[in-house]
A protein has these predicted regions:
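A glycine-centered beta->alpha junction motif in the catalytic cores
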Residues: 1-4, 22, 35-44, 152-168
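Conserved kinase catalytic-core helix
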Residues: 1-32, 51-66, 70-79
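Short, polar/flexible loop-turn hinges at active-site or ligand-entry regions and domain interfaces
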Residues: 1-3, 97, 117-119
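Active-site acidic catalytic loop and adjacent metal/ATP-binding pocket
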Residues: 60-104
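Active-site activation/catalytic loop segments of kinase-like enzymes and analogous catalytic loops
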Residues: 103-138, 151-166
Length: 189
């Protein structure tokens, strides 16, 4: 397992974006579908107004537009990959989606390792992205917008894999991601 971000991770996500890219109306994408599902469960979320505001921003940006999206592995973490002969192999694709903003898996890798291996709080994780903002903006255009897209995506994934009442563990994860959304909203950038 490779626990630090390396060139092989970037190459993998670049290939994934290039090989799976497709153009569609935003309203016909998996991302919009998942946002709709998340919206349907807003009343169960911590910080629902913060989530709702982020969703409105994303929808306003993409509404009625043709977008070029690609596959989102959705669980791109060191414990779901291995390297052999200089090649990265990724497994556990059960949460993958086909039409999402490209390269969101980068945020999943960074955030999950920061939470589970470094035990960092939301504000420190956001500060790490901010410190790397110029490089990330070169990749994403506006990394903060892409990070919001990722946070909404992961919230939708976690909320919708549970039926009925959200478990305490999932609620706590959602609260963590909401703190990150709030941090992005309140940042001076």
């Amino acid at each position: 397992m490779i626990h630090c971000w390396e060139a092989m991770h970037s190459c993998f996500l670049d290939r994934l974006a290039m090989q799976t890219r497709q153009t569609a109306l935003f309203e016909q994408t998996d991302f919009d579908y998942d946002l709709n599902r998340l919206e349907g469960r807003l009343s169960q979320l911590p910080g629902a107004s913060i989530v709702e505001k982020a969703m409105a921003e994303v929808r306003y940006y993409y509404a009625g537009c043709e977008v070029e999206f690609s596959a989102f592995q959705a669980d791109f973490t060191p414990w779901n990959m291995f390297e052999e002969g200089g090649e990265l192999f990724v497994f556990d694709w059960e949460y993958a989606r086909l039409t999402y903003p490209p390269r969101l898996d980068y945020f999943h890798f960074r955030i999950q390792t920061a939470i589970f291996e470094q035990h960092l709080p939301a504000d420190v994780i956001c500060a790490g992205f901010e410190a790397d903002g110029n490089r990330l903006n070169g990749i994403y255009g506006d990394y903060r917008f892409s990070l919001k897209c990722y946070l909404l995506a992961v919230m939708s994934l976690y909320v919708n894999r549970e039926s009925g009442t959200i478990s305490r563990d999932t609620y706590n994860r959602l609260a963590f991601w909401v703190k990150m959304l709030e941090q992005l909203e309140n940042s001076d950038l």
